[in-house]
Structures are given as structure tokens and as C-alpha cells.
Amino acid sequence: MIKKMMFVMVSGLVLMFTSCGNQHKAQSLVKDFLDENLVDQDCSYERFSRLTPTAMISFGQMKAMRQNVSKLPYVKKNIDYNDAAYPDTLLYLRATYKLTNHQGEKQEVTQTFYLDKGLTRVIGFK
């Protein structure tokens, strides 16, 4: 437990010093992921939170998140998360965006996205 806490703290410091580049990369990754996996791709991004590390999400919790998300009407079914080994530490950020449906109705959505440490893939979101 102490090792995990130390790792998270050290990761936080490292991220603080490299956050600008990683923040932009994470936002781009989330945007690309949503562009590929939203049913209606008319999406405008409002804001993103800071990229933050966490070691508190187990693979079982992630599987449950994925199942819940697959029930949302604006998300495509059977998303390919390009599963590899589940990382010990994830990075997450919250994204707020607006969706516009075919009738022109807007819906604001805020979701948390979990990314791998290398910022190469979205592991899941809720």
C-alpha cells in the first residue's frame, strides 16, 4: 500500500513537470476515441480536467464501467479497447462535451476517461 502511495506521489510530481505536453496528448487521445466511438459524431468539446494518476481502479471495476457505457444510446456498441496487459497505474481526466442529435437537440455530457501511462489508448470511461 505504501509503495502504491509513493508511486502515485512520484508519478504526480513527474506529471506536474511534463503536464503541458501530456495534457494535450491526453485530450487528443480522448477526442480521437470519441470521434471513433460516438454514434452521432456531432460533438463540441467544452473543457477537460487536469490529467491525474490513479492506482485505485481494478480490472473488475473497469469491466463494469465498460458494460455500463455500452448501454448509453450515444455510444457505439462493442468498442475495441485494444486490450493488452492491464496497467498498475492509470491516468484519468474528465471531459465535458456537447452532443447534437439529428433533431438539433443538444446534450451536455461529462465523463471520466482512463488512459494508459504511455497515453497510447483509452482503457475505459464512465
Map each language-model feature to its residues:
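Sec-dependent bacterial lipoprotein signal peptides
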Residues: 1-20
